[in-house]
Amino acid sequence: MDRISSLPDEILEHILSFLSTKEAALTSSLSTRWKNVFVFVPSLHLDYARQHENPREFIDFVDFVNTLFNRKGNSPIKKLALKIHLKDNQSLQNQTHVQSWIHRVLSRGGVTDLDLFITFKGKFQLVPLLIFKSNTLVKLRLGRGFTIKLCHENVYLPMLKTLCLDTVDFDGDHNVFETLLPRCPLLEELVLEDQRWKQWCGSVSSPSLKRLRIRFFHIPIISLDVPGLVYLELSCIFGSKYANVNLDSLVEARLNHWVEEQELRKLRDGSSHLVPADMMDLITGIRKVKVLHLTSDALELFYFSGQELPMFDNLVYLSIASDKKQGWQILPLLIKNSPNLETLVFKGLEHYTTKQCGDACVCSGILGKSSSCLSSSRVKVLEIWSYQGTSKELKQMGHFLMKLQFLELVKIRAVSNLQVPIDIQYLLKLPRASSNCKIQAIF
């Protein structure tokens, strides 16, 4: 007997848990010793996500899963990961199988991780009522492209800590979180990806939530009453109104807003019907963060909010994505209002040229005549991503080095597809206001 086969069942089951259930089942042909080991692996990874054309293949898959459940008997299942693609002409029958498998896993108890990824050929499909009652479930992921019927009495997840909803809808509930969140009292992480809740009012309220990630195309009104939240990632198109923003414990925020080019032009010439000031409640709500990441659109939306920025007294790390179509107008005030900023990251240096950049950049040609945001900043670390070594970028780097008096380290990350190597010597020879400043180039 080989050494692996002599290992205890518990260890063999743990090894097989890293394989898909289909792959683990293949080990049953190795010897009598291996015949039933895979059956008792506490995690199931069932994958039928490919768009098979042969109906017989799905029948074989269903038979395999049903046989597996029968052979497992009452042995515990800690995790179920199910990826499956359903065709329109067989969807109702196939949904019944899926619903049965989920019920069998939840009803036996002990499951801590449930990951369902169901896709359909064609339009959104209605999945029959799913009963989510479990005293042990810790992680639940649902996706993508289907509608769930959800009733108040069919949801009770007292141990759930992570909930991920990826492109799913809920039938007949204008505010699904009034049903879900109160029945998940320990929930710490909520992920909402590309939701299609046409009737959702955009409200999230939870005293236990620590991490929240939302990615929607558009939500008219967003309410965030999550006083214990420490991480927020928000991605949506400009136009949402923010109300009741309670983020007193927030440590890190990623604002990935985007603005259509035509709408951005209207904002600049004052003809937009949208109200940029509606973002001010969000900006004020995140004022206590230590780490802030902004897309180029989000940075410009800060400027068009039309009101004085709050003080970001706790901010130590600021990351800004730059694009030639978006400006740095708000950057001088943002840096000025961040007195404890230590690390400043630019994901690219190219940006839309305006006269409002102050001495943050060299593009306007009015250096020294506007706010001295860089000269008064105590930034110690400056990072530049996607550096191409152009003459304009080199000039901008020289400006940073001469204005930031407390710099200790400059990290330069070159763009990956450079055709001509960057001569680092030009950077190293630039004069610096700080005698302790070192330059580190990563190519």
UniProtKB/Swiss-Prot annotation:
Pfam family, one: LRR_At5g56370
UniProt protein name: F-box/LRR-repeat protein At2g42720
LRR repeats: 139-167, 169-194, 201-236, 271-296, 323-348, 363-389
Keywords: Leucine-rich repeat, Repeat
UniProt entry tagged with the keyword Repeat: yes
Gene3D superfamilies associated with the record: 1.20.1280.50, Ribonuclease Inhibitor
Keyword Repeat belongs to the record: yes
Residue ranges constituting the F-box domain according to the UniProt record: 1-47
